[in-house]
């Protein structure tokens, strides 16, 4: 597909590409989402939990009295690290040249095509920062590789042309205990560009609190000069070019989507679905559409009454593709779990690889991304279009 709107929908949520550099900040405390469950048997393989090791690392960094690390500590550590680098550079003036490879990516969670200049693209990696292209993706240049935080997770552009991006991930980790580890790191709030083309970005000082260190999703209102941010702390509405913020919902928010009329949808960390009502409040959908785990959302650009949900269970297994054709009043399960539709694989990576997108000109055609790639339409049903081989799990 070459249609710009579809590319924006699908590429902006893709979890399989990114950047190769890595900067991480220190969490203020050991998040509940990073705790690893008890040891479980998966077939003939037994996996050991690393919760003890994680606790040990955290305990060495915490305040002995409060048991936490204050956000200010992170800022101070960044300043000290920069000073050390400058001192070492002055003493040993070495010149480095990048030798490559330069075509290896990691994981992109933020993607944006400039609303007024289609050749200007932005891509944000969870460990490499924000990159910009003025050639429709043929070449890229880093924007923020010297800024405070390179954990870019979401990006949006308002109708006024201002571009905002958020940092820090909200604990994407397999909670079952059968796959140890977590890729999530805290961020440093929001950044914005007001030059009209996204050449430079500055930190928004009103987002330095811990509430803005885990920015999971961001969408701009299609008609009004405002945007919404979904964090581990809730949903925030930003107006006045980002200068004014209002919390409109609480809880862990994993994904936000907004339709062409400005109606906001959200999914929570526990699989609940929220929709904005006429008064601007977020209301929970019927419990029957709760998938139990991470859920991705897609709204048809053609018809906002058509909304799709692709869910993962609490263990990360595929729990189904659901659709409403009446704006959420009723729901139908289009695809159920089976050995054929197991799009998240035997590793149950629905907590990690989970994206769904609607074709911009066909509200009955959706693209489903997990470990594998599939489509669903009202004529052919579920069809797998690409997959990965299911290699044996290395327990060593």
List the model feature ranges, each with a label.
Residues 3-396:
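Extracellular glycan-interacting surfaces
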């Amino acid at each position: 597909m070459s249609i710009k709107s579809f590319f924006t929908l699908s590429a902006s949520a893709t979890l399989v590409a990114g950047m190769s550099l890595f900067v991480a900040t220190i969490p203020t405390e050991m998040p509940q989402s990073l705790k690893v469950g008890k040891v479980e048997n998966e077939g003939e393989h037994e996996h050991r939990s690393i919760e003890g090791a994680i606790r040990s690392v955290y305990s060495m960094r915490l305040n002995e009295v409060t048991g936490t690390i204050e956000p200010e500590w992170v800022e101070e550590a960044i300043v000290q690290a920069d000073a050390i680098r400058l001192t070492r550079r002055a003493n040993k003036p070495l010149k480095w040249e990048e030798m490559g490879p330069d075509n290896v990516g990691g994981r992109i969670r933020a993607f944006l095509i400039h609303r007024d200049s289609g050749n200007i693209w932005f891509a944000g990696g969870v460990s490499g920062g924000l990159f910009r292209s003025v050639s429709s993706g043929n070449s890229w240049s880093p924007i923020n590789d010297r800024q405070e935080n390179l954990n870019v997770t979401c990006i949006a552009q308002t109708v006024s042309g201002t571009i905002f991006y958020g940092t820090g991930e909200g604990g994407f980790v397999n909670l079952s205990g059968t796959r140890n580890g977590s890729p999530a790191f805290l961020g440093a709030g929001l950044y914005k560009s007001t030059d009209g083309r996204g050449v430079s970005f500055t930190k928004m000082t009103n987002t330095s609190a811990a509430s803005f260190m885990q920015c999971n999703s961001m969408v701009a209102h299609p008609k009004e000069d405002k945007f919404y941010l979904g964090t581990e702390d809730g949903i925030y509405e930003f107006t006045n070019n980002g200068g004014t913020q209002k919390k409109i919902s609480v809880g862990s928010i994993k994904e936000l989507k907004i339709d062409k009329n400005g109606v906001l949808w959200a999914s929570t960390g526990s699989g609940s679905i929220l929709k904005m009502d006429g008064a601007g409040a977020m209301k929970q959908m019927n419990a029957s559409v709760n998938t139990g785990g991470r859920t991705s959302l897609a709204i048809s650009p053609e018809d906002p009454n058509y909304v799709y949900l692709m869910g993962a269970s609490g263990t990360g297994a595929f729990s189904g593709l659901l659709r409403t054709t009446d704006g959420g009043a009723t729901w139908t399960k289009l695809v159920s779990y089976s050995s054929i539709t197991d799009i998240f694989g035997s590793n149950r990576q629905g907590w990690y690889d989970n994206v769904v997108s609607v074709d911009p000109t066909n509200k009955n055609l959706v693209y489903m991304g997990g470990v594998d790639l599939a489509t669903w339409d009202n004529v052919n049903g579920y069809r797998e279009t690409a997959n990965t081989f299911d290699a044996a799990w290395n327990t060593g």
